[in-house]
């Protein structure tokens, strides 16, 4: 409630300030026009006295300066007025161009069996733990999202941008959700050499693609890996032909691990490792047919987590690594095939291994492999369609009884644009989760949504 009041108050103040800025610029423009007209009249009177005959009007430094200021003010007012639409909110802070963006999303979800965790599907609970007839209904607006894109003026060929983005999946009650941090980074780009440095929190380089699902988790825990974390990233691009590009990215990222075995209340095993995780990706983009481009990439990471085993200084390091391939392949004008395959170990913080990292009973990393494939159709008129499948398959030899041994899902959805800004959609999916030495769990999931983009 406090945040809602603050947000409304901020919006009110922002809009008032925005209007005041336009009004102030208009007044300045009016004053400058009057000054120019007065100077022109005085100059004309003096000229008529000295030279009665007609002659071309001379240019003066003062007049040129005032005309230039007047032109710049007119251009600035025109730019502000064009950007003042409620659904394209831009404003200037000094010389920074700041754009507000996001969407409001309302979801209604029915599950035929207990899904973890209802609002967003990860996996299905085992029939031995939960009655298989225990269906669920969820209503939520937590995926509502907003952010700010920030752009500074180009300076000596260097482009500086930033992003801040949040949603409401930060915990709290179902009707009192908390804000959650998604992105916050600065990016400096040398345009001539196509080299950039990024510092802050954003997506992993590992397996960078996502399928288009109405379910918030985009097949994470059932075939799609990769998340967000703090990082320092270096990127370089090369033009290798007409509409073709090679790109290389490398990043030092924070190692986000499980809570420590000995001190779970305050010590993170990734933090305790004492050094960052290394991520990298190489990608190529090539034109195919119908002026559409295909992209291919290979990516991966390596890091370590340190678990304290006792209070005498005994500890054990656990590796975390991955290797992934990604592809985007246009098939026709509005049809594309996208997907990823991967293999790795200790992938819980990357939403792999069905969110299992280390077998703490056997003190062993959990290996896993998986991937996903999606067919995307549209937009065709006001419609868009998606079909896809994903699977995450941990190594049974690394598991203890009761741990998740496989998780897969298949889905189909459609979106329809009611207006330029408002979209409705529906999705049906089937989920099946296997367990080591326990019964499986499966569920049919029906998901409807309404979205207002801004």
Question: Model-flagged regions — what are they?
Answer:
Residues 2-8:
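Sec-dependent signal peptide recognition
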Residues 416, 441-454:
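Outer-membrane beta-barrel "beta-signal"
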Residues 18-117:
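N-terminal periplasmic/intermembrane-space "pro-region" immediately following the signal or transit peptide
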Residues 89-120, 126-258, 274-287, 328-332, ...:
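Outer membrane beta-barrel
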Residues 111, 153, 168-173, 202-208, ...:
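Sequence/structural signature of outer-membrane beta-barrel proteins
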Residues 275, 280-404:
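Detector for outer-membrane/organellar transmembrane beta-barrel domains
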């Amino acid at each position: 409630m406090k945040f809602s009041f603050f947000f409304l108050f901020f919006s009110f103040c922002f809009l008032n300030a925005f209007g005041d800025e336009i009004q102030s610029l208009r007044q300045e423009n009016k004053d400058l026009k009057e000054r120019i007209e007065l100077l022109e009249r005085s100059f004309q009177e003096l000229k008529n006295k000295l030279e009665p005959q007609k002659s071309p009007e001379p240019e003066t430094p003062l007049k040129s300066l005032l005309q230039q200021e007047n032109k710049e003010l007119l251009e600035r007012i025109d730019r502000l007025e064009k950007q003042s639409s409620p659904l394209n909110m831009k404003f200037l802070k000094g010389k920074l161009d700041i754009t507000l963006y996001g969407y409001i999303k309302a979801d209604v979800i029915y599950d035929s069996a207990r899904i973890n965790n209802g609002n967003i599907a990860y996996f299905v609970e085992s029939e031995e733990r939960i009655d298989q007839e225990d269906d669920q209904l969820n209503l939520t607006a937590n995926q509502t999202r907003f952010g700010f894109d920030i752009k500074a003026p180009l300076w000596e060929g260097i482009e500086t941008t930033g992003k801040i983005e949040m949603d409401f999946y930060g915990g709290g009650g179902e009707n009192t959700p908390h804000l959650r941090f998604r992105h916050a980074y600065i990016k400096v780009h040398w345009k001539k050499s196509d080299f950039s440095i990024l510092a802050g929190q954003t997506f992993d380089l590992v397996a960078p693609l996502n399928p288009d699902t109405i379910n918030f988790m985009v097949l994470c825990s059932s075939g799609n890996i990769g998340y967000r974390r703090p990082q320092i990233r270096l990127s370089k691009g090369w033009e290798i032909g007409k509409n073709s590009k090679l790109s290389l990215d490398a990043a030092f990222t924070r190692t986000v691990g499980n809570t420590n075995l000995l001190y779970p209340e305050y010590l993170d095993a990734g933090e305790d490792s004492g050094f960052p995780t290394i991520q990298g990706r190489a990608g190529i983009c090539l034109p195919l047919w119908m002026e559409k481009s295909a992209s291919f990439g290979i990516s991966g990471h390596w890091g370590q987590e340190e678990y304290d085993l006792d209070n005498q200084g005994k500890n054990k390091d656990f590796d975390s690594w991955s290797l992934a391939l990604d592809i985007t392949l246009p098939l026709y004008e509005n049809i594309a095939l996208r997907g990823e395959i991967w293999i790795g170990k200790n992938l819980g913080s990357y939403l792999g291994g069905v969110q299992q990292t280390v077998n703490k009973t056997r003190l062993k990393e959990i290996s896993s492999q998986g991937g996903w494939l999606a067919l995307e159709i549209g937009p065709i008129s006001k419609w868009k369609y998606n079909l896809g499948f994903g699977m995450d398959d941990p190594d049974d030899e690394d598991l203890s009884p009761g741990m998740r041994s496989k998780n897969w899902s298949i889905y189909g959805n459609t979106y329809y644009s009611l207006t330029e800004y408002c979209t409705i959609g529906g999705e049906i999916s089937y989920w099946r989760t296997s367990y080591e030495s326990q019964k499986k769990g499966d569920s049919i999931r029906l998901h409807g949504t309404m979205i207002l983009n801004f």
